[in-house]
Amino acid sequence: MSNQVISTIEARHCKRSFLKKEIPLEIIKSVLSSAANAPSSKNTQPWQVAVLSGQTIKTLSDTMLAKFDQNQYEKPDYQYTTDPISDIFRNRARACGFALFDLKGIDRTSKEQRKEHDRQNFLFFGAPVEIIFFLPKNSERGNFLDMGFYMQNVMLGLLSNGISTCPQFSIAEYPQTIRCVLNKTEDW
């Protein structure tokens, strides 16, 4: 028996190379709207979304790359994982990283190759559209769960329309830059 939802979930994985193909804004709007059926505490839907393409995505990319290339980092608004990370999770992350580097032919001992790989994050891996999700400043863990449900719906909705995705924490290393380029207040 075939189940389209399960098939879509099983097909979802991170893409790190995208076609130079325009994505109709109507599809993105439809997916974002449908994805809002995700559960959130008291139906608060505490997120905001910015959809970037064209000159806006180029401006953000260029601005972050200029800082990245000079080893200038900002403080992320939130910590992504525990510090220190437990051995079981560290081992999983290493295995994933080793497999990715092997697949891409990256020598793990080459700082230059690793830096170029990391640099691709700020080029959004060539994606023609970037969707950035925001939560209010001082959000709590539950708000992150709510937004995570929404983000997963967005990724699955896009995939069901033939559009792959790659969620990225790396750009969260530049929260002030993102807010500046996108004219967001410090409250987000």
Task: Explain the meaning of each model-derived region.
Residues 1-188:
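Acidic, surface-exposed loops and disordered segments
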